[in-house]
Structure formats: structure tokens, C-alpha cells
Amino acid sequence: MKVILANPRGLCAGVNMAIDVVDQLLDICTDEKICVYHEIVHNRHVVSRFVDRGVTFVESIAEVPDGAIVVFSAHGVSPAIRQEARDRNLTAVDATCPLVTKVHAEAIRYSKRGWQILLVGHADHQEVIGTRGEAPDAIQVVESPEDIPHLRIEDPAKLVYLTQTTLSTDDANVIIDALKEAFPEIKAPPGGDICYATTNRQKAVRALAPACDLVLVVGSRNSSNSVRLTEISENVGTAARLIDDLSEIEDHWFDDVKKLLVTAGASAPDDLVNDLVIHLVERFGGEVEQWDVDHETVEFGLPGSLKTVMRDRGIDPSGRRIVIDQSAELHEILDSRGIPHTTVDLTIGASG
């Protein structure tokens, strides 16, 4: 069986930043209680590993003990949550993905100008809850084209749509096209809102899945972008399974599978993918090929609130960046085990 690794896959820069924020707080605030508001990212393994290191995850600021540090997750929070933390004089560290922050800024800007905002996304997703909280009187959530007849529009000439960053581009475009048909004057967000990592991982599956017999997506079931990857594979005609880790696979899945595509959601740690690939090759034989559909060269700076915590404790944060390079580690592991592997370059450039 040939195991094909989709590239890009797995951790994005925003998730890496959020995980790094908690890692660094654990290293420098050894005698302080660290809480995270909501799951830092939507991955069971990431959360459980932090719990094992003493982090407490909460669903309300009231659960945070006095004097503790509270971290806002990668999905972002509403102004009301930030104010609640300030009212309690908690040390708050913001690990919101910068691309989510961009959507928040757009919501604030358009609402201040008196525009109505149609937010395309899942109403119960933490990111949408946080964005909606920036301008609750101006924002209406649109989950499907069926919601459009029920929208309350005052002036179609002052109407803009924004989107949840982790949506399937296919699903989002269906809703956006329906909005444009219903409201021809509706304005699009500058540069689009669906993040580069979501787009690239979906593009890779859309391009590679038709050449494969089965797709395995590593990710948790509450990860929106991971679920979307399985749906995209199925939409192009290739069966797909979403797994948290290799413990969930069953041997009969691979009967008659000659080409297996492996990818991962943007919140799935690299070691889960690495362990899966090694297990598959050692169990079923074969070789590994990485098929590069895009090259991501993305890095984020540390959040300002984390820099403040570091400086307050005598640590200089200068020059620190969050950089992604997931392929090198896996190639080294495969080499060390003598597993044949090659890279196929299908790219037409770099993105992100």
C-alpha cells in the first residue's frame, strides 16, 4: 500500500501560536495557576496533554480562581468575556488566532459605520460566538441558504458578509452565492475571511483524494476544519474516515486499498500523524510519498499580552516568532527507520 501524505496538512500557524502560548506560560509561571477559557484548540490530545501538566480548562470566567492567569483560546472571545476578566483583575493572555482577530476587526469597523453584517458560519461554534459578541445588534448568523428568507435587512446597500475562518470553501460559496442572489449589493470582506490554512488543506484533499482509494483525516470530531476535510473527500467520490489517532483504525478499512491519502486538521499535532504513518507502513508494508500541493511559509509573532507577562517576570521576548515546518521531522523519522519516502512537487507557488 502506498501512503500518500497531503501537504499542507496539520498544525497551522495560529494553532501553533496558541499551543506555544500555553507552553511558555507553563515554563515561566511555575507557581501560578493557569486556566484556559474554552479548549485552547479543538483537539482532544492537545487538551489532555495540558491537563496532565496542570492546566485547567473552563467554560466561564467565574470558574477561574482569583489571582490565576486566564488564556483566551485560538477561537477568540467576545468583548464581554474580556471585560469580565478585567473586572476580576485577572491576568489575561490572548491566544486568539490573528486571522480570527481580523474578522473581529471587520465586524467592529462595519458595525460602527452602521452596516448590517451577515456572519456565515455555525452559530454554536466558539469563533462565531466571539465574533458575534463584537457587534451583537449588527450581526445575524447565516448557517445555510434556508436562513436567508428569515433575515431582517434594513438597507441592502449597507450590507456585508463575513465568514467563520474554518468553513469548507465549498459550503461557504454555496451560501455566499445565495446571499449575492438575494442581495446583489452585498459587500464582500477584503481579502476573504476563510483562513489560508483551511483553504490550503481543503485544496490539497480536493486535488489528491480522487487519485486515492481512501482518505484518513487525523483530527477531533469537534474540530470544524477536520470534519470539513472528510466531507470534501466524500464530495469528490473518495471514502474518508476521521480519527483522533491510530488507536481508532481498523485493519479491514484497508482491504483492497492501494493508495491511502493521509491528512490532518489544523489543530492535530504532528506526532499523531507521524505515529499513524509509521504504524501503517510497518503493518501493511509499502512506501510513503508526500504530495506537495502548496508551500506554506507563515509565521506569527508572540501575542502582546504574553510579552507583557514575560517582561513582568524578567524574560526578554524579543525576536521570538512562531514558525511552521512540519515535513522535516517526519522525513528524519522515516529515514531513521529505513522507510522509503519521496516527495512529489505539485505546487504552483507558495501561499499563506
Describe every region a protein language model picked out.
Residues 1-264, 270-330:
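The feature marks the mature, well-folded catalytic cores of soluble enzymes
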Residues 328-352:
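Generic N-terminal targeting/processing segments that precede catalytic cores or assembly contacts
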